[in-house]
């Protein structure tokens, strides 16, 4: 799953894909590099990012999705997900040609999201996000480790199973649901690593998405220090390979070609 952020302030690629022409070119390059899905988002989830209105998100993502659908060539038929927590944005994106919704709130920020997914029959990624003070929602450098009574894997997996059940009760096809443990969202470095190691406990319920690409905890693990996003590729690839071995099957990434090659090699060795 290639990350196509049409935002000026995303942590790893902010501003790089702003504008329809730039975004479509990035999407085309990602597919040529081996991406199977495009994830297009109009609001950054980096620490401290400004809240973006529904109208502005729609203004950013809908023309890009429509242009991808109209461009043909390598983009013809490639599945597109829209990265949003707002049902109105998701509805507009689906009308423009999106096939799925990637919701970092897991359908909890907007009461209309579950109903929309059920009515439109589209795919959905449900992510776990610990509700902590806003400044800490996306941190992994806590002075005090976030509390997960019973252990982080048990709590996160239980929350995702319960939310998956709510989607299914509304009529969403279980085969269209992907589960995301929310690495880097309200977890310490140690807790992120535990979630990776115990992925099979969650993948027994449904396919698991790995969303660790270039996140700050990756640098703390691989480099032993705070680092910039551009320093985290090698660490990202290493942890992605481990996440594959642990059971993850969808990888949301900035660096498509590198991941395609690394994961293909790892998957062959696992066969």
Predicted regions, residues:
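Active-site-adjacent loop and "lid" segments of alpha/beta metabolic enzymes
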Residues: 10-26, 45-70, 78-79, 84-87, ...
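Catalytic domains of carbohydrate-active enzymes, especially glycoside hydrolases
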Residues: 25-41, 246
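Short acidic/histidine-rich motifs immediately flanking catalytic phosphotransfer sites
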Residues: 31, 35-36, 75-78, 97-98
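Acidic helix/loop microenvironments that form the catalytic cleft of cell-wall polysaccharide enzymes
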Residues: 183
């Amino acid at each position: 799953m290639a990350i196509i952020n049409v935002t000026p302030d995303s942590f790893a690629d902010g501003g790089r894909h702003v504008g329809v022409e730039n975004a479509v070119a990035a999407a085309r390059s990602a597919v040529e590099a081996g991406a199977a899905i495009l994830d297009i988002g109009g609001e950054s989830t980096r620490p401290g990012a400004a809240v973006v209105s529904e109208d502005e998100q729609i203004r950013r993502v809908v023309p890009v999705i429509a242009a991808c659908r109209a461009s043909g060539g390598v983009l013809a038929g490639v599945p597109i997900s829209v990265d949003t927590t707002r049902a109105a944005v998701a509805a507009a994106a689906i009308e423009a040609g999106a096939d799925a919704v990637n919701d970092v709130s897991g359908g909890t920020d907007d009461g209309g999201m579950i109903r929309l997914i059920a009515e439109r029959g589209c795919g959905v990624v449900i992510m776990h996000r610990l509700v902590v003070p806003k400044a800490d929602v996306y941190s992994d450098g806590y002075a005090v480790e976030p509390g997960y009574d019973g252990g982080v894997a048990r709590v996160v997996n239980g929350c995702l199973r319960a939310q998956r059940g709510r989607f299914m009760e509304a009529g969403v096809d279980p085969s269209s649901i992907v589960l995301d443990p929310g690495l880097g969202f309200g977890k310490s470095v140690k807790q992120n690593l535990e979630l990776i190691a115990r992925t099979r406990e969650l993948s027994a319920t449904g396919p698991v998405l790995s969303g660790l690409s270039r996140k700050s905890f990756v640098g703390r693990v691989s480099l032993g220090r705070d680092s910039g996003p551009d320093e985290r590729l090698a660490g990202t690839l290493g942890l992605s390979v481990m996440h594959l071995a642990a059971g993850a099957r969808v990888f949301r990434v900035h660096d498509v070609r590198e991941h395609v090659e690394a994961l293909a090699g790892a998957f062959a060795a696992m066969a």
